[in-house]
């Protein structure tokens, strides 16, 4: 039982060395998981005080080893042929990894340059479903600058019962980020894609050119000039003013002519004969100041001289009668 506990502690120590470059958070998670596994295996069996002391000492060794791993001297990556050193451990996968599931590729920081080909068969129990479907070309050469990179590298090769090996590469990055040229990878073949994912996809860019149709329209109707309504208003105003002025002028001239003609007609107009004959009955009628006698006996027009008392009656009767002596005799026809 004590030997099993030592083996587990050694495996946790080795695993902590591997995961020391990932950061403080990954170290705490891994150590707590491994310690939890140790406690699960040792739940049902009593452990002596010596084994507990050994566990405490092993925990102290784990913390010191983590500090040493974090302060380990950096490796010069360009001096190596492939930039990766392999460390093999003889411990089995059951004791070294526990219930953890191995991954095919572990990448930590953005400046990490890593290419990995998984050799695990598909029907192996530890085959991961997250394996990359495309593998890099074996002749892929990373183009690196001549700068010396201060990165620490830890590799581990785990052997499984199915004779399949998994290589895990871990690079710890320094706080300073050196300039690195991008990796040049030559693909070994065309990408295999499903036909369903590219339905309706066209490899070329379609360009649609619109050909405008020329349509000539009268711009005066669509966009009338703003000065045209003003001109039309001016023309209509001029015509209306001319008509109104003509009417007023004619009426004014008519009024002036009427006034001039009225002044000329102010004098009284009377019909006068060129000679005055008092024996005419019309003149007697016009000059009669009093009403005349209309009796049958005296049917002549009124004459004031006839009513004079100084005149004899014979003369009055003679004037009143019609003289018949001057009538010539009628001539008989032969």
Curated annotation (Swiss-Prot):
Residues 24-236 are extracellular. It comes from the Eukaryota. The keyword Secreted applies. Highly glycosylated (N- and O-linked carbohydrates). GO terms for cellular component: extracellular region; Golgi lumen; plasma membrane. The gene is MUC15. Residues 258-334 are cytoplasmic. This is Mucin-15. Glycans are attached at residues 30, 61, 79, 90, 148, 155, 163, 218, 225. Keywords: Cell membrane, Glycoprotein, Membrane, Secreted, Signal, Transmembrane, Transmembrane helix. Residues 77-94 have a biased composition (Polar residues). Residues 64-104, 304-334 are annotated as: Disordered. Residues 1-23 form the signal peptide. May play a role in the cell adhesion to the extracellular matrix. PANTHER family: MUCIN-15. Expressed in spleen, thymus, prostate, testis, ovary, small intestine, colon, peripheral blood leukocyte, bone marrow, lymph node and lung. InterPro entries: Mucin-15. The keyword Ribonucleoprotein does not apply. It comes from Homo sapiens (Human).
């Amino acid at each position: 039982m004590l030997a099993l506990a030592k083996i587990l502690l050694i495996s946790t120590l080795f695993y902590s060395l591997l995961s020391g470059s990932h950061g403080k958070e990954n170290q705490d998670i891994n150590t707590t998981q491994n310690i939890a596994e140790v406690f699960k295996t040792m739940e049902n069996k009593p452990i002596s005080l010596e084994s507990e002391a050994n566990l405490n000492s092993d925990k102290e060794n784990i913390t010191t080893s983590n500090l040493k791993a974090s302060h380990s001297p950096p490796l010069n990556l360009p001096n190596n042929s492939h930039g990766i050193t392999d460390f093999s451990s003889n411990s089995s996968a059951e004791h070294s990894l526990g219930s953890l599931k191995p991954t095919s590729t572990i990448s930590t920081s953005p400046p990490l340059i890593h290419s990995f080909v998984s050799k695990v068969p598909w029907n192996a129990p530890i085959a991961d479903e997250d394996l990359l479907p495309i593998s890099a070309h074996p002749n892929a050469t990373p183009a690196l600058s001549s700068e010396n990179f201060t990165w620490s590298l830890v590799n581990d090769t785990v052997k499984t019962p199915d004779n399949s090996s998994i290589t895990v590469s871990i690079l710890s990055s320094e706080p300073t980020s050196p300039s690195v040229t991008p990796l040049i990878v030559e693909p070994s073949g065309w990408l295999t894609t499903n036909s369903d994912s590219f339905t309706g996809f066209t490899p070329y860019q379609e360009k649609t050119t619109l050909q405008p149709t020329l349509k000539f329209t009268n711009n005066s109707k669509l966009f009338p000039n703003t000065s045209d309504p003003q001109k039309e208003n001016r023309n209509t105003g001029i015509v209306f003013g001319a008509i109104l002025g003509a009417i007023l002028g004619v009426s004014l001239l008519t009024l002036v002519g009427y006034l001039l003609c009225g002044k000329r007609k102010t004098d009284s107009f009377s019909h006068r004969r060129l000679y005055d004959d008092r024996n005419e009955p019309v003149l007697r009628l016009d000059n009669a100041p009093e009403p005349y006698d209309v009796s049958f006996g005296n049917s002549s027009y009124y004459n004031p001289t006839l009513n004079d008392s100084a005149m004899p009656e014979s003369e009055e009767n003679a004037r009143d009668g019609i003289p018949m002596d001057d009538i010539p005799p009628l001539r008989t026809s032969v």
